[in-house]
Design a protein with these regions (language model features):
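Extreme N-terminal, non-catalytic leader segments
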Residues: 1-2
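Hydrophobic positions on the alpha1 helix immediately C-terminal to the Walker A/P-loop
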Residues: 16
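P-loop (Walker A) phosphate-binding loop of NTP-binding proteins
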Residues: 8
Length: 164
């Protein structure tokens, strides 16, 4: 069984995730900002060529970036908030490569989200803010999606998950 913990800021999501991780130690826990098979919040999603440029630009912390990076086809996911550095502007620079906050067209955003859920195979996992919070917020704020459009998005996603 998988657990998806959702809620507004301050509602106790992290506390509940911590309790579930203690109660079910065999579960893999994905907190917001971790590398997750389904969620990309607080992660930069870049092409291989842009990734190489980032490694060159931040050569002094290259090892830290590589330790917090994951290959996904022609892209790399950098969990940049996990990189502890005092380099001015590093986190702000990588933030621009998140898929949220209207940085991508809605079609590209949808393609990435659906692809991640279609390719996810797993059980015994606990996810924080991975199914609704970031996706719904982004859909409400940037393409200004209506309630019916958001529900349609999730209906289509559910159908695609059933096909897996």
């Amino acid at each position: 069984m998988n657990y998806f913990i959702e809620g507004i800021q301050g509602s106790g999501k992290s506390t509940l995730v911590a309790k579930l991780s203690k109660r079910y130690p065999s579960c893999t826990v994905f907190r917001e900002g971790d590398y997750s098979p389904v969620e990309l919040a607080w992660c930069a999603y870049v092409t291989k060529s842009r990734y190489a440029e980032i490694l060159d630009q931040y050569y002094s912390i290259r090892d830290l970036i590589e330790e917090n990076s994951y290959a996904e086809g022609d892209h790399r996911v950098i969990c940049y908030t996990k990189v502890i550095t005092d380099i001015p502007g590093f986190h702000k620079d990588l933030e621009q490569y998140e898929i949220y906050n209207g940085r991508l067209s809605f079609d590209e955003f949808r393609r990435i989200v659906f692809h991640r859920y279609e390719n996810w195979i797993g059980d015994d996992m606990v996810f924080e803010c991975s199914l609704f919070q970031n996706i719904v917020e982004d859909m409400m704020l940037y393409p200004n999606a209506s309630d019916s459009e958001i529900l349609g998005f999730y209906r289509e996603l559910a159908v695609k998950r059933k096909e897996v």
